A protein has these predicted regions:
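Local beta-strand N-terminus motif with an aromatic residue
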Residues: 81, 164, 209, 232-233, ...
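NAD(P)H dinucleotide-binding glycine-rich loop of Rossmann-like/cofactor-binding domains
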Residues: 92-170
Length: 348
């Protein structure tokens, strides 16, 4: 089969790879679309980060849609031909956290496209519990967005946001805009986004943001205070993964407010806790998702959310490096979520 495989930094190849076979409890899916995530981009541009060099070559990708083509022994909750999407991680089911159904912080996690072969290929295999059935009303394109949308929903749930709350989001990537969609679906009264890319800020406004604040032109903390009568936001979300934007998210939150950290941080930084202490602010971590895939699929099926503006281009898998990874690195202004269309055998 054809696959997009990571060999090292700036070395990702479209090539032939062994076609996987499902073991007991696994499902084999024919992939329709795979999304390029910020994690994939980081591994391409500056990896290995989460990928072990000993795993190379490894097929990238954890955001996907497709259909079931083969069932491993013992799988009874799916059938051949089912349209599916799925999780990007696998849990052990045995550790302290798994026994408490906190699978997202499993001590022995495996990650599609990082520790195991992923979805940027004609076929992939994964444990049956990593798949979800799709209703006919959800397209393959939108289904490939379920994973990042689930990250957004999990963060909103962790924030304990209530209908009528004011929300501020620091970061204008796919996760930041997924949080925007989910906060609005959960009843946020106002949502402000801190965005340094005018193109992405425009997308955020079209998706429902009440204001987009450019940190290069104005102070986001002061601007949110102006917009909230001097209080600050009830809930803030950090979706960048930078110590400076983490501090910003805390500073934007009102007293007794909540700042949720979603971004993937690759370095430590100084942090001033005085405002947290005297303002009784709460800082909460949010890691991927647990039971959010099914609610996201329901929201898509009922058309209560429309993530179409997240998709800025669709490119063939064989052109993923130049038209996907490189474009995302060189032109963040006009590129957000790139979907890779997986070729059929006759196209290879």
């Amino acid at each position: 089969m054809k696959a997009l495989r990571w060999y090292g930094r700036k070395d990702v190849r479209y090539e032939d790879a062994p076609e996987p076979f499902p073991e007991a409890g696994q499902i084999k899916a024919r992939i329709e679309y795979a999304g390029i995530c910020g994690t994939d981009l980081r591994e391409y541009a500056s990896g290995p980060c989460m990928i072990s060099p000993t795993k190379a070559p490894i097929t990238l990708g954890h955001e996907f849609s497709g259909r079931v083509v083969q069932l491993g022994k013992g799988v009874k909750d799916f059938k051949i031909g089912d349209r599916v999407t799925g999780l990007g991680y696998w849990a052990c089911g045995e550790c302290y956290f798994c026994k408490r159904m906190q699978y997202n912080i499993c001590l022995n996690q495996g990650f599609s496209g990082l520790t195991e072969n992923g979805c940027m290929a004609e076929y992939m295999v994964a444990p049956h519990y990593a798949f979800y059935n799709l209703p006919g009303s959800v397209s393959y394109e939108y289904a490939a967005l379920v994973e990042p949308l689930a990250v957004g929903l999990h963060a909103v749930r962790k924030s304990e946001m209530r209908p009528g709350d004011t929300v501020a989001i620091v970061g204008d990537g796919t996760i930041g805009l997924s949080v925007l969609l989910m906060a609005l679906a959960a009843g946020a009264a106002s949502v402000y986004i801190v965005s340094k890319h005018p193109g992405r800020a425009g997308i955020a406004r079209k998706m429902g943001a009440d204001a987009a604040i450019d940190p290069g032109k104005e102070d986001p903390v002061k601007q949110v205070q102006l917009l909230t009568g001097g209080l600050g936001a009830d809930v803030t979300f950090e979706c960048v993964g930078n110590p400076d934007t983490a501090q910003m998210a805390v500073d934007i939150a009102r007293r007794d407010g909540i700042a949720v950290m979603i971004g993937v941080f690759d370095r430590a930084g100084p942090f001033h806790f005085a405002d947290v202490v005297f303002g009784e602010k709460r800082i909460v971590g949010s890691s991927i998702y647990v039971r959010e895939a099914e609610p996201v699929i329901a929201l898509l099926a009922d058309r209560r959310i429309d993530p179409g503006l997240l998709i800025t281009s669709r490119v063939p898998l064989q052109e993923a490096v130049e038209l996907g990874f490189e474009k995302l690195l060189k032109d963040k202004e006009n590129n957000l979520k790139v979907l890779l269309k997986i070729p059929k055998k006759e196209d290879c």
